[in-house]
Amino acid sequence: MRVWIDADACPKAARDLIVKFALKRKFEVVMVAGQAVAKPAFAIVRLIVVPSGMDAADDYLVEHAVPGELVICSDVPLADRLVKKGVAALDPRGREFDERNMGDRLAARNLFTELREQGQVGGGQGAYGEREKQAFANALDRIIARLSKS
């Protein structure tokens, strides 16, 4: 079992939760980033820094993650590529990406991108608080249990 993290966009609190789960359940964590990020000092955690470039980390994740593994990412187009490949994907707020919801998630992402470009809505998501951490922990637990049975 392996959990991949799109580390450039994943909150530290979510990364810490993943490592805590990994230590308890004995699975590998691979953090992929376009720049150096703090790597927890545990042997089960690897950090891969990819050459900078448009979507370099995304491309690496799609190329290396395989069905039966989980990728933590906020990027909806990346999640779509992973789901099409049969890889489980979860955002740091506890929302799982799957074939049933990808169309809606992509449409919402595209709409908000257009509205932001037109200046009609502000930037990103709200703060990453206790509610988000708890939702993420619950979803992570559920998905890891499901993938471990496969």
From Swiss-Prot:
UniProt record similarity statement: Belongs to the UPF0178 family.
UniProt protein name: UPF0178 protein PputGB1_5282
This chain's source organism reads Pseudomonas putida (strain GB-1)
| Taxonomy of the source species | Bacteria, Pseudomonadati, Pseudomonadota, Gammaproteobacteria, Pseudomonadales
